Design a protein with these regions (language model features):
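Polar low-complexity intrinsically disordered regions
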Residues: 18, 46, 92-100
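Short, basic, glycine/proline-bearing loop/turn elements
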Residues: 20-30
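Acidic, metal-binding active-site segment of PIN/NYN-like and related structure-specific nucleases
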Residues: 37, 44-64
Length: 100
């Protein structure tokens, strides 16, 4: 899958997801940090299968679009914690989910 990580998620997620065989980018690595939500969505929506974010407003806004989103926007609800623990919790959830 083609995965994009929002700027509010740790960069430490990139390598573990790539290790699983996914193509992974982050908003930071694409130098799109700070872009308003609407523009960010238009820039990346068609290039990715999944977009992970902790931004509730962004996820809610996409869910109200009249047209179906070409990218699955996944609101990440893992509580804030040190990066290593966050990455471990995220990856445990990711590998136990059927993304088909």
């Amino acid at each position: 899958m083609r995965v994009l990580l929002d700027e509010n998620l740790p960069e430490g997620l990139v390598e573990p997801l790539r290790f699983l065989g996914h193509t992974v980018d982050s908003v930071a690595s694409l130098r799109l940090k700070g872009l308003d939500n609407g523009r960010l969505y238009r820039e990346v929506a068609s290039a990715y299968d999944l977009f992970f974010t902790k931004d509730r407003e962004f996820a809610n806004r996409v869910s109200t679009l009249a047209e179906p989103a070409p990218v699955g926007v996944i609101l990440t609800l893992i509580r804030q914690q040190p990066e290593a623990q966050f990455v471990a919790a995220f990856m445990a959830s990711f590998v136990s989910t059927d993304w088909s």
